[in-house]
Amino acid sequence: MARRRALSTAALAATAALVVSAAPAHAANPSYVALGDSYSSGTGTRSYISDGTSCLRSVYAYPSLIASAKGYDLNIRACSGAKIADVSNTQLSALSSSTAYVSISIGGNDAGFASVLTTCAQPAWLSNCNGAIDKAQAYVNQT
């Protein structure tokens, strides 16, 4: 009887060990990297993440909102004022084989988007809005 109890206890312990080891590990949240310029960083929200940069990254930027809603681990590399070369030189290194999602918005600073806005916000007799738009459009078409 004692031997049978010992065998039953050993079998139960072995089964419990198998069940514990067969349990799936808690899956990590998907990794999401946000690249780009002020459109992605959240410039203009007036509520910025203190990360030691002048990138004006915000908890209200669309990447932050998506990551929060979906449960993604966010690495926001987007930076206010970034140009295409900045993404290539300083942001792409955030991507890895574990990156599940990527978003990017870039090109407005290269094309002179801010100049178009400031030019076209002036009275027509004082500025050349069409010329500013044409210049930006030419840049986009040639890129």
Language-model-derived ranges and their functions:
Residues 18, 50, 72, 118-120:
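Residues in and immediately flanking transmembrane alpha helices
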Residues 27-78:
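Serine-esterase "nucleophile elbow" of acetyl-processing enzymes
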Residues 42-44, 84-87, 111-115:
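Extracytoplasmic/secreted cell-surface and envelope-processing proteins
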Residues 79-99:
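Catalytic-core regions of hydrolytic enzymes
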